């Protein structure tokens, strides 16, 4: 069962679901909570490696994964981020989310932004039960024009679904979970698989 706006408010008030900072009620509508773009970004460098072998996370051409991506860059609220057509950037949400063990979250982009070419997540849009931390967005500009992004702009919406019972292995208790208590923009950790 998906939570409606009234349910979301009740889960937040009971602190079963935690979103920090606590969302203003104007951001909770229908079945979603609007969330904002954070100020931490990671960009891909132009490089000479021809491809990444996803079976072993090696870049053909001798580079490592850390060499193809910038360190985390922190933008001020006034500082724009320019996302060129055909470019991918990793960035974090402004909000931090703590999920209970009996709730799954779903991240969706905003239709108005998608109509301009902005994809909010490449594939990872599920927020697992037991998740705790910022959400990293894999944003892609599929449009023809450069998109200007600014920290704290409304960027996406979260919806929540109640599970039939609490999960046996919540994300925060899994030994192999690669992104526990994520703060900021954590790059791919495929090499830890």
UniProtKB/Swiss-Prot annotation:
Keywords carried by this UniProt record: Hydrolase, Nucleotide metabolism, Nucleotide-binding
Single Gene Ontology MF annotation: nucleotide binding
Subunit and partners: Homotrimer.
Highest taxon in the source lineage: Bacteria
InterPro entries per UniProt: dCTP_deaminase (IPR011962), dUTPase-like_sf (IPR036157), dUTPase_trimeric (IPR033704)
Pathway of action: Pyrimidine metabolism; dUMP biosynthesis; dUMP from dCTP (dUTP route): step 1/2
Residues reported to bind dCTP: 110-115, 128, 136-138, 171, 178, 182
Gene3D superfamilies (UniProt xref): 2.70.40.10
HAMAP family, per the entry: dCTP_deaminase
UniProt keyword annotation of Calcium present: no
CDD domains per UniProt: trimeric_dUTPase
Designated name of the protein: dCTP deaminase
Protein purpose: Catalyzes the deamination of dCTP to dUTP.
Similarity-based family: Belongs to the dCTP deaminase family.
Top-rank EC class of the record's enzyme: hydrolase
One record GO biological process: dUTP biosynthetic process
EC number in record: 3.5.4.13
Active site: 138 (proton donor/acceptor)
């Amino acid at each position: 069962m998906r939570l409606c706006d009234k349910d979301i408010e009740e889960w937040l008030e009971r602190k079963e679901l935690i979103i920090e900072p606590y969302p203003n009620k104007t951001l909770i509508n229908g079945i979603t909570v609007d969330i904002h773009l954070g100020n931490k970004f990671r960009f891909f460098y132009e490089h000479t490696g021809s491809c990444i072998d996803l079976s072993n996370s090696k870049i053909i051409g001798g580079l490592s994964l850390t060499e193809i991506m910038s360190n985390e860059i922190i933008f001020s609220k006034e500082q724009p981020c320019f996302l060129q057509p055909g470019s991918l950037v990793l960035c974090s949400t402004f909000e931090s989310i703590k999920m209970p063990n009996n709730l799954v979250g779903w991240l969706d982009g905003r239709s108005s932004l998608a109509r301009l070419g902005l994809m909010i997540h490449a594939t990872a849009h599920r927020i697992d039960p037991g998740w705790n931390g910022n959400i990293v967005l894999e944003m892609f500009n599929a449009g023809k024009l450069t998109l200007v992004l600014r920290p704290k702009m409304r960027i996406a919406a979260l919806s929540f679904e109640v599970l039939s019972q609490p999960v046996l292995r919540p994300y925060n208790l899994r030994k192999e979970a690669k992104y526990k208590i994520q703060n900021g923009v954590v790059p791919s950790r495929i090499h830890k698989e």
